[in-house]
Amino acid sequence: MTTMNATAYHPNDGGGDGITATGTKAGYGTVAVDPNVIPLGSKLYIPQYGEAIAADTGGAIVGHKIDLCMESYEECYQFGRRDVQVFINY
């Protein structure tokens, strides 16, 4: 288990096409990570979010930061920024 600073994103942020760094479609359960901290493809469990797959990256996602994909912009705003526990390959 590790503690990470989490933010939330929507698949269409920045005019993106919703395709992750690993080529999958982004959706709830997809998270962006720094692959130097959490390898892409890792199965994760985040108590405030649920089960997830590390399938994406992001320019601001460096070190112990994680970005959780949400289904709506409202969910992103409600989530905000917070520290979360991340269980890797649980």
Residue ranges and their predicted role:
Residues 1-90:
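Solvent-exposed, well-ordered loop and adjacent helix/strand elements within mature globular domains
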